[in-house]
Amino acid sequence: MSDTRIERDSMGELQVPAQALYGAQTQRAVDNFPISGQRMPAQFIRALLLAKSAAAKANVELEQLTTEQGGAIVKAVEQLLADDFLQHFPVDIFQTGSGTSSNMNANEVIATLASRVLGDAVNANDHVNCGQSSNDIIPTTIHVSAALALHEQLLPALRHLVQVIDTKAAQVHHHVKTGRTHLMDAMPVRMSQVLGGWSAQIQGAQGHLEMTLPSLQSLAQGGTAVGTGINAHPQFAAGFACQLSRLTGVEFVPGENLFALIGSQDTAVALSGQLKTTAVALMKIANDLRWMNSGPLAGLGEIELQALQPGSSIMPGKVNPVIPEATAMVAAQVIGNDATIAIAGQSGNFELNVMLPVIARNLLESIELMANASRLLADKAIASFKVNESKLHEALSRNPILVTALNPIIGYLKAAEIAKTAYRQGRPVIDVALEHTELTRSQLEVLLDPEKLTAGGI
């Protein structure tokens, strides 16, 4: 038995692996683009398959396909989604900029399975791709896959991170530490205030991501080749959105201007910008954890992160902050992905953006990476760290910046003199203030109480 079979397309005959579900156009793409070895993301292929099912159902309702043809296409998609469908989608990310190769890959695979279901020929172009163009189905799939990934992965992960931070903040509320600006000693803060800042950052990022959902759920489908809707039924866009909403449980609607949705990727660029904002917040939190955990003897040593693995192949006993480090690398990757998406978003020359596959890949990678990193940061770093109270107390007792609380009483210059003397002599600020002011020790103990200073005011 031969390892290959002959398939035909508009360019002629081509050898295709005998057991492959795809046909000639997919094989041409495999041959043309041996670039990265990276396939389109699973979330993207899943969304593309769901879109094909929704299209078939809409076309049956609009009498563009027979009930049998549409049913066979829907059944084929169900079979793929229930199986290891990625093995049937070998096309490289770096392919034709419209994503036509991935669209035809889906059309051919579905057509093969649907033909088996129907017992008659289902055509990849005429039936599976009915009323569609790569130029609207791929932008649509980018929106759908990103919206589903936000709903299913990233937003739940960020909510979990906020919940863990808030729970930890309540647990460490009684701990007061030296605040730092410019990495230099500053006025005291509660540990709960530090974590409260983190929580607010993540909640803000979450809110900004949610604001992109209405635009993501607005689809290019129905615009076909250039936005005019040529060869699509006038009611196809609405029918497609309705069917897709039923399939996914997410409300999708036809876009108001299909020319904009096909010729640009502004929504993807906007979403990527908010993903970058979220990445910056995660980077800040990761770095705060690393600094507070630094030491254990020669660093700040304010907290102790959970020990997860040996930290060195040469230094016995060394343990490193691996989860914050991994999170920081994820943040760096997301920031880099955003730069690529911004450049790709500029490539909407006239009626079509021609960097769609790399936009899809980077967008979905950013969402997945941050969803996974957020949960790890929550569960393996924030939830389990321990506070080193003795280190906090030692640093606070020697912090000359506490004298800031005396500014309204003795003035800035006098307070600065006391701070410098305390620092130079390595003495507690309260002892130096006792010598340089007329305030009593009991008064100074009240005025310089770190816990009270965390409340602000005069």
Which residue ranges define each predicted feature?
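Conserved, well-structured ligand/cofactor-binding cores
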Residues: 1-458
